[in-house]
Amino acid sequence: RDYTKIFDAIYHAKRVLTYGSGSSQTRVASEMKRIFLPHKLFINLHGHDMSQAIEKKVQQDDVIFLISLSGESDHMIDLAKNLRMKGAFLISVTRMSSNQLALYCNDSLYIESTHMKVGDYGDYESATPYFILIELLYIALCFAAAIAI
């Protein structure tokens, strides 16, 4: 897959914001900010109350990563619709499936999640693929930047 569009958007962005819809997604957004921060101003926003702040302050030269498990949460879909109207470049990060969130984003990244039954505790879905994805994205972006120099 060619990630040039995403790399160009990040390179030209004034700010890159990350927003996770749940606790695991918020941890992924926080880790994304940590590893990318030396190269770009990354802002990690979390909590439903912060979505209103994003909507008010977003600019056309912002890139926003919207990290969601299913991509079907009404909150995330409404947020994407509103941010899209403001002209920001949106990238969804969801599990591999056709989903509503991806429809409102300029580009999408997908993970293949693993479900496990954990005794009597029910199903468990690993967040590890999200962390692998953002780390690979970071490495690829560093290589792309090195080639451009």
Regions from the PLM with identified roles:
Residues R1-H12:
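A short, well-structured juxtamembrane/interface segment
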Residues Y11-I132, L136-A145:
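Glycine-rich phosphate-binding loops that contact phosphosugars or nucleotide phosphates
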